[in-house]
From Swiss-Prot:
InterPro entries: Isochorismatase-like_dom, Isochorismatase-like_hydrls, Isochorismatase-like_sf, RutB
Catalysed transformations (reactions): (Z)-3-ureidoacrylate + H2O + H(+) = (Z)-3-aminoacrylate + NH4(+) + CO2; (Z)-3-ureidoacrylate + H2O = (Z)-3-aminoacrylate + carbamate + H(+); (Z)-2-methylureidoacrylate + H2O + H(+) = (Z)-2-methylaminoacrylate + NH4(+) + CO2
Gene name tied to this protein: rutB
Name of the featured protein: Ureidoacrylate amidohydrolase RutB
Classification via NCBIfam families: RutB
Amino acid sequence: MEADAPAGYRDPSGRHGAVTLPARPEPIAFDADATVLIVVDMQNAYATKGGYLDLAGFDVSATGPVIERIARAVAAARAAGIRVVWFQNGWDPDYVEAGGPGSPNWHKSNALKTMRRRPEMNQRLLAKGTWDYALVDALTPEPGDIVLPKPRYSGFYNTPLDSMLRARGIRTLVFTGIATNVCVESTLRDGYHREYFGIVLADATHQAGPPALQEGALRNIETFFGWVSDVAAFEAALSSDEARRIPA
């Protein structure tokens, strides 16, 4: 392989993808038809005042621009023929899927701990069918998109994601959403261990907690598990690929 070749999946002949995305720690190439854009947990719970994160004491005041940039990434992906996968984190209204005291999730989930501390919140936080569980109004799945519920941080845990990706020949996962340091990183890590190439569009993500957690998560990803880029670079790379495919 050439020293200056981009990272990314190569087919048996050694050909890398047609789209090259500037990224850290190096550019990465992918084919649009072997890529999905994953939107992680853009629910009222995580991105809206009065949602779970806000009620649990996390700052959600900066999520507006993130939502706008995710909308741009979704539009660019759809225009390039990249399928969009939406995740919604949560459980049934009785929280059976959340696990009881025998599950570490029962002890570590801030949503469950908030409801135990504030019983009036019970069956309101991250319960399927509630406002908290719903995607934010500005981001709407369209026909052809994939919408998956997930009961834990990783989108690979107890979901059909892996089989759905493999059935479609997907090799590259482009991530947006909340929270960078929790569900985004957890899903990207699990994808890495399943031989998927993971890319995070940093300015289309937001952390749960102080800004240092965003910086740390992105540094961890680019050093050990994947690649980090941004929405403008993603749009430009896809536009360049589209221009190359249009006959003169």
